[in-house]
Amino acid sequence: MSSQAGNVGSSSSSLAGVRMVVSPKAQLRHARLPAASASMYSDAKYDLNNYKFEPIKESIVAREMTRRYMTEMITHADTDVVVVGAGSAGLSCAYELSKNPNVKVAIIEQSVSPGGGAWLGGQLFSAMVVRKPAHRFLDEIEVPYEELENYVVIKHAALFTSTIMSKLLARPNVKLFNAVAAEDLIIRGDRVSGVVTNWALVAQNHNTQSCMDPNVMEAKVVVSSCGHDGPFGATGVKRLRSIGMIESVPGMKCLDMNAAEDAIVKHTREVVPGMIVTGMEVAEIDGSPRMGPTFGAMMISGQKAAHLALKALGLPNELDGNYKLNVHPELVLASTDDETASA
């Protein structure tokens, strides 16, 4: 694959022998912020002792929320790509897809809070470790980090997650449907053609309430990013197994960070026509090792899934070498491999 400039420029300061690296873009962004001055806070409209909001009718608030949400539901009832699961892999996939303004992307996340396990590092600690060369993705989205020889450390995992979400959700071709569950797949012949959706609270209470039918979202491509096994994990591949479209889901093996991250990126693929698997769900379907609290493979697996989706849509992508947008050397796309698994 093609490579951009090798070394990323940075400014550094001493921190107990460790360099603090901030991407050049981040430096420019901070440089544009206006310096705080007394005049900024002395303006009458910012007088906190006499602060007054403009009046509004309660019904206007209700209409604005309802109209906009329902419009998005109508818009994405038939969409290009549905990403199921808004963890670090799903968000990275959606971010990469959203660079093409003509690709309509819907993200489904059953939690009220997107981000999956990427709000914290391991064992509820706050730092996030990312092995090189995946740190170049952090440079692109302007997340600062401490740089060591073979890896970088973000001081708090939430810095990555909040940054990528704010950049992604600002794009007009992306909609996040959080508190929404994917209850099932739409299958036509041998192809996944969309997802069956419901409010997450409804999906979790089918046993306590009378029958509550779902909704649907058709898609040209479904990206399953449902994480590793658990009450709500690996749901995409487990459903494929239950209907006989794949033979087995052996589950991930014991932890091996070095083997796990390479394997997850390499084997991110279209497992059946119309459905791409990314992130830790790849380890579940392949029986490859779990990686523990390192996150680089989640980001790059998500990027690879995006390019697989672009390829499936017949659009320029890095796998075919015809991608014209900004591509970074961290995209290890293994384009010589067979991208569709045999069921």
Swiss-Prot record:
Cofactor note: Binds 1 Fe cation per subunit.
Location within or outside the cell: Plastid, Chloroplast
GO-annotated biological processes: thiamine biosynthetic process; thiazole biosynthetic process
Coiled coil residues, start to end: none
An MF annotation (GO) of this entry: cysteine-dependent adenosine diphosphate thiazole synthase activity
Residue numbers bearing the 2,3-didehydroalanine (Cys) modification: C211
Keyword Oxidoreductase: no
Co-factor requirement: Fe cation
Function, as annotated: Involved in biosynthesis of the thiamine precursor thiazole. Catalyzes the conversion of NAD and glycine to adenosine diphosphate 5-(2-hydroxyethyl)-4-methylthiazole-2-carboxylic acid (ADT), an adenylated thiazole intermediate. The reaction includes an iron-dependent sulfide transfer from a conserved cysteine residue of the protein to a thiazole intermediate. The enzyme can only undergo a single turnover, which suggests it is a suicide enzyme. May have additional roles in adaptation to various stress conditions and in DNA damage tolerance.
Any further remark recorded for this protein: This protein may be expected to contain an N-terminal transit peptide but none has been predicted.
Subunit structure: Homooctamer.
Name the record gives this protein: Thiamine thiazole synthase 4, chloroplastic
Organism: Physcomitrium patens (Spreading-leaved earth moss)
Name of encoding gene: THI1-4
